[in-house]
Regions:
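Non-catalytic, usually N-terminal nucleic-acid engagement modules in DNA/RNA processing proteins
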Residues: 4-81, 221
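Eukaryote-skewed repeat-based solenoidal scaffolds used as protein-protein interaction platforms
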Residues: 48-54, 58-59, 63, 71-217
Length: 222
C-alpha cells in the first residue's frame, strides 16, 4: 500500500489491505460469530499477574484512553500479549458528542483509530469482536460505518445509565444499531438500562469498577 507521510507518522501500516467504507473511509471490520469468553478484563487489568485463565477472558478497552494510548504508540509491542486471550473487543478511544463534546474531527479520528487497530489485530491473527459506539441520531450517518451485519458485537454503558435521559438516549441508539447491523448477539459491559427492550441475545459483563464496588460491599458485610 502507499504510505503518504515520511516515516509513516500516521501509521498507515495498520490498515494494510483494509477495505475502507463509508463517507470517511473507515476500515471495515469483518463480522464474527465468536461466542465471548467467561468474562472480560480491560487492557490495563490484562497485565495483572493475578490473571491465570487468559484463554477464558476477552480484553476490552472500556477505560480511560490514557490506559491504552501505548497500544496506538507501539502496537507491535502488544500483539503477542493480546494473543494470550480468548478474544479482544475492538479498541474504544473516546467519542464524546453533544453540546460539550469533542469536535467532530476528533470523534472521527478516534473512530478511525479504533478500526485501524482492530484491523491490525486481525492481520496478526487475533480474534476481534467489533465494538459499537451507541450515539445520538445526529451521529448515525457515521458511527456504524465499518461494521457488518449479523456479527457478535460489544458495547459499554459507562456514563450512560446515571440519568433517565441518558438511558433513554442509549436505548434509542441501541434500537437503531439493531436495525442497521442485525447483530447475532450483543455483549454489554456495564449495567444494562432497565428501559432497554430487545429480542437480541444479550451477554452482560461487569466493568472493573462494578467488581471493585461489589467486593467492597461484600467485604463490609463480613
Amino acid at each position: 500500500m502507499q504510505i503518504h507521510t515520511a516515516y509513516d507518522v500516521m501509521k498507515e501500516f495498520l490498515i494494510t489491505d483494509a477495505d475502507l467504507g463509508g463517507k470517511y473511509g473507515i476500515p471495515k471490520i469483518p463480522k464474527t460469530f465468536i461466542h465471548p469468553g467467561k468474562d472480560t478484563v480491560d487492557f490495563a487489568e490484562s497485565f495483572s499477574r493475578k490473571i491465570k485463565n487468559h484463554r477464558e477472558l476477552d480484553v476490552n478497552f472500556y477505560v480511560d484512553d490514557v490506559q491504552f494510548q501505548r497500544l496506538w504508540n507501539q502496537p507491535d509491542k502488544y500483539m503477542e500479549h493480546l494473543k494470550c486471550f480468548h478474544a479482544v473487543i475492538m479498541p474504544d478511544f473516546s467519542i464524546s458528542v453533544g453540546k460539550n463534546g469533542m469536535p467532530l474531527a476528533m470523534c472521527l479520528w478516534n473512530k478511525y483509530r479504533n478500526h485501524a487497530l482492530a484491523h491490525y489485530m486481525i492481520l496478526n491473527d487475533i480474534p476481534v469482536i467489533p465494538n459499537v459506539s451507541i450515539l445520538p441520531e445526529y451521529c448515525w450517518d457515521w458511527c456504524f460505518d465499518g461494521l457488518q451485519e449479523g456479527s457478535t458485537v460489544a458495547c459499554c454503558t459507562n456514563g450512560r445509565v446515571k440519568s433517565k435521559a441518558a438511558r433513554l438516549e442509549f436505548c434509542v441508539g441501541f434500537k437503531e444499531m439493531e436495525r442497521r447491523l442485525k447483530p447475532l448477539r450483543v455483549i454489554i459491559v456495564g449495567r444494562i438500562p432497565e428501559e432497554l427492550e430487545t429480542d437480541t441475545e444479550i451477554i452482560n459483563f461487569k466493568t472493573r469498577n462494578q467488581k471493585i464496588n461489589e467486593e467492597g460491599v461484600n467485604g463490609n458485610n463480613d
